[in-house]
Regions:
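Sec-exported extracytoplasmic/periplasmic mature domains
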Residues: 12, 16, 46, 63-70, ...
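Extracytoplasmic/secreted proteins, especially bacterial periplasmic and envelope-associated proteins
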Residues: 6, 15, 19, 23, ...
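Surface-exposed binding/hinge segments that line
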Residues: 29, 40, 74-119
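Gly/Pro-rich hinge or "lid" segments in bacterial periplasmic/extracellular proteins
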Residues: 108-160, 164-166, 175
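Short, well-ordered beta-strand elements
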Residues: 36-39, 58-61, 95-97, 134-139, ...
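N-terminal lobe/hinge region of extracytoplasmic solute-binding protein
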Residues: 1-30, 131-132
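Aromatic- and charge-enriched surface segment that lines or borders ligand/interaction sites
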Residues: 26-71, 179
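Solvent-exposed coil/turn segments that connect beta secondary-structure elements
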Residues: 16-17, 33-34, 42-44, 58, ...
Length: 182
């Protein structure tokens, strides 16, 4: 999941004081019962493949999570009520989430790193090229348990600190120590 920080981003994020703030979202409103959330997306956000981030893309990702069901170690499905209804309005640039019960902390739930938005148009190639809006994108998948080579996302809206990042997985504590010392 640490990889998600560089490849994907969420509608919300935790700031340095651990307060939730909009990230891919520009703003949001919530009804008094905390059962209907209308989230307005920021304009001009692009996925690493150049496609625009739209409310429909976000809705498709949430639907994909429901379809996949709880699996893997991250289980992003647990951060959005399974029965929630998600409606996308691309013209208004809004996403409406209706829950069956009050959900006072929905922005906090959507700020969790596993809720980074992914373009699910091509789910066959997730390992080799997850499409996100983050500062980096996958250049090379080096194999399970080996890692990834990341490159700067040319469609990112800000400068990134590095042109390339190598993520290496090391299960052995001694190997980690030796790698850090070299």
């Amino acid at each position: 999941n640490a990889m998600r920080y560089g490849i994907t981003e969420g509608l919300f994020k935790f700031n340095d004081s651990m307060e939730v703030e909009p990230w891919l979202a520009e703003s949001y409103t919530v009804n008094d019962e905390h059962t209907e959330w209308v989230i307005t997306l920021k304009d001009g956000i692009k996925f690493s493949d150049g496609c625009d981030l739209t409310p429909t893309k976000v809705k498709e990702y949430f639907e994909y999570l429901k379809e996949m069901g709880p699996s893997g170690s991250a289980k992003p499905q647990k951060y959005l009520e399974f029965e929630a209804t998600v409606t996308a309005d691309d013209e208004a640039n809004t996403l409406t989430i209706q829950t069956t019960q009050p959900y006072a902390n929905l922005p906090g739930q959507l700020a969790h790193p596993t809720m980074g938005i992914v373009d699910v148009a091509d789910t066959e190639n997730f390992d080799n090229g997850t499409i996100g809006t983050g500062p980096y994108m996958i250049d090379t998948f080096n194999g399970v348990g080996v890692g990834y080579d990341l490159v700067a996302n040319p469609n990112y809206r800000e400068e990134v600190p590095y042109d390339e990042v190598k993520l290496m997985y090391m299960g052995d504590a001694s190997a980690k120590t030796m790698a850090l010392q070299s």
